[in-house]
Amino acid sequence: MSVIVSNTTPINYLVLIDHIAVLPQLYARVIIPQAVLEELQDEGTPVKVKVWMAAHPAWLEVRTVVVPLGASLAVLDAGEREAIGLAQELAADALIIDEPAGRVEAQRQGVRVIGTLRVLYDAAAAGLCDLAQAYERLKHTTFRAHPDLYRAFLDMHSQRRD
């Protein structure tokens, strides 16, 4: 994959677990919409993430959505709406998004979605991180995923190495 758009949550948690550097190693272009930038600088955002965003690296592109967003996106928050819209506008290879409602709507709109767990799985497959350790760090944040999902990725990774 070369071009991905990200929603707020994946950037937030990858920064918190010190694995944000895998993104430019996995993807040629990593793009977020303006609303995601604003959410990552919001008052409720963890300090570590705000500090990282204040001087974010050049590989993280911030773009404004130009194409009008569809009415069906109105039920989502601004970051999700703009991330889906930008992924469509740019014909991105995928959208990194974890929120269930956003994932469903993105898929309904024809956008390929992956989540934070998949990004870490792909990073581990590329030798960029230890998957079990990354997942363990993620479990010590407020990130939530069903234990079966963690287990499925760990099993796939184990089979891949065998």
Predicted regions and their residues:
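Short, glycine-/small-residue-rich phosphate/pyrophosphate-handling segment
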Residues: 144-145
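Positions that flank functional sites
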Residues: 102-103, 121
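Short alpha-helix plus adjacent loop in nuclease-associated cores
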Residues: 114-125
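Active-site-proximal, substrate-binding regions of enzyme catalytic domains
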Residues: 2-94, 100, 107-111, 133, ...
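Residue-level signal for short amphipathic helical patches enriched in basic/charged
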Residues: 97, 126
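C-terminal structural segments of small proteins and small subunits
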Residues: 139-141
